[in-house]
Swiss-Prot record:
InterPro entries, per the entry: ScpB_csome_segregation, WH-like_DNA-bd_sf, WH_DNA-bd_sf
Organismal lineage: Bacteria, Bacillati, Bacillota, Clostridia, Eubacteriales
Protein name from the UniProt record: Segregation and condensation protein B
Species of the source: Clostridium tetani (strain Massachusetts / E88)
HAMAP family membership: ScpB (MF_01804)
Subunit comment: Homodimer. Homodimerization may be required to stabilize the binding of ScpA to the Smc head domains. Component of a cohesin-like complex composed of ScpA, ScpB and the Smc homodimer, in which ScpA and ScpB bind to the head domain of Smc. The presence of the three proteins is required for the association of the complex with DNA.
Function: Participates in chromosomal partition during cell division. May act via the formation of a condensin-like complex containing Smc and ScpA that pull DNA away from mid-cell into both cell halves.
Pfam families named among the record's database cross-references: SMC_ScpB (PF04079)
Length: 189
């Protein structure tokens, strides 16, 4: 698609806000800057500027949604303070929550990624096949390749869904293991 060089003024900026908001809403998934830019036929620099303004506007306004950036992609999400109402709507039940084994497995994948099933099993001390399958089904982890050793075991890493689920923009926002250890030690006191 051909990109146009619009002069961004208040009128067409509002029009781009509207178009981008519609795209993000209809998509339901994060959209990359380049994709948005191509669809609205605007250069990436101006598109990024509009997206940043949109993020600020959503923060200021008393709305139920906000625009977030996750690993250089943009998505409309509900505000955290409304999560209890969303849960009621979706009637979240305990069968949808993660088991202790799945949480342990997810933690290992998050901190050691990319990681093989054997690595996870060794750290947990038990088999993790079922937990890995659950996490794959819930799209919290994904297969990201194979290790170049005999048997070529599958490598697992976390997904964008993992980041969204835990309110992170990047895996770098995870607390360090040292911080977690410190926190647990303080709780024990």
């Amino acid at each position: 698609m051909k990109q146009m060089n619009y002069i961004i003024n208040e009128e067409n900026e509002l029009r781009f806000f509207s178009i981008i908001e519609s795209l993000l809403f209809a998509s339901g998934e994060p959209l990359g800057l380049k994709d948005i830019s191509e669809i609205i036929e605007l250069n990436t620099l101006d598109t990024k500027e509009i997206l940043q303004k949109m993020i600020r506007e959503y923060e200021i306004e008393k709305r139920g949604i906000k625009l977030i950036e996750i690993e250089k992609k943009y998505q409309l999400v509900t505000k955290e303070e409304n999560s209890c109402f969303i849960e009621q709507l979706l009637k979240t039940n305990s069968s949808q929550s993660l088991s202790q084994a799945a949480l342990e497995t997810l933690s290992i994948v998050a901190y050691k990624q990319p990681v093989t099933r054997v690595d996870v099993d060794e750290i947990r001390g038990v088999k993790s096949d079922r937990a890995l399958q659950t996490l794959l089904q819930k799209s919290l982890i994904k297969e990201t390749g194979r290790l170049d050793v005999p048997g070529r075991p599958i490598l697992y890493s976390t997904t964008e869904e993992f980041l969204k689920h835990f309110g992170l923009e990047s895996i770098k926002e995870l607390p360090s293991l040292e911080e977690l250890l410190e926190e647990f030690q303080e709780e024990d006191l």
